[in-house]
């Protein structure tokens, strides 16, 4: 399976607080059988919130890309197809970062791994069995 981790999941991973995630999420995301991605959109959101003093990601911002790569995550850039993708059904959220993550899932055939209740109801979100 191919997963895109949302910002909240990436923050939990960066802080090394795996106990905050369902064990099935950790197993699926870190399994060599699956491909898991971290979006540039999420890193951008983390950087903005950190610089505004609203978030402590647990690592220096410059260290995040290397850390995510070290734990087996692939990076996903934002491209034009992601930027213009309309979503069906419309997500129940207005946050532009969440919307671009869903657009990336739709374009790249990924499933969104999230702990955000508002996002978890969208058909592009993955629910552990």
Question: Model features per residue range: what roles?
Answer:
Residues 1-38, 52-66, 108, 117-120, ...:
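Short, well-structured N-terminal submotif of metal-dependent ribonuclease cores
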Residues 9, 42-43, 82, 101, ...:
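Alpha-helix capping/helix-boundary segments
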Residues 6-7, 46, 86, 105:
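Generic structural signal for small/hydrophobic residues in well-ordered secondary structure
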Residues 16-17, 49, 89, 125:
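Residue-level signal for well-ordered alpha-helical positions
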Residues 11-12, 47-49, 84-87:
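A short acidic, helix-capping loop that chelates divalent metal ions and anchors anionic groups
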Residues 56-58, 62, 69-115, 124, ...:
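Active-site neighborhoods of divalent-metal-dependent phosphate/nucleic-acid chemistry enzymes
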Residues 38-41, 78:
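Short glycine/serine/threonine-enriched helix-capping/active-site loop
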């Amino acid at each position: 399976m191919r997963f895109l981790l949302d910002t909240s999941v990436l923050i939990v991973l960066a802080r090394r607080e795996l106990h905050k995630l369902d064990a099935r999420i950790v197993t699926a995301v870190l399994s060599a059988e699956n491909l898991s991605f971290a979006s540039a959109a999420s890193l951008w959101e983390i950087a903005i919130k950190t610089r505004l003093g609203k978030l402590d990601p647990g690592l220096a911002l410059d260290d995040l890309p290397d850390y995510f790569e070290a734990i087996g995550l692939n990076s996903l850039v934002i491209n034009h197809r992601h930027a213009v993708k309309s979503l069906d059904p419309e997500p129940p959220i207005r946050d532009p970062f969440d919307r671009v993550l869903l657009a990336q899932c739709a374009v790249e055939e990924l499933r969104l791994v999230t702990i955000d209740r508002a996002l978890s109801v969208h058909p592009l979100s993955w629910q552990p069995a």
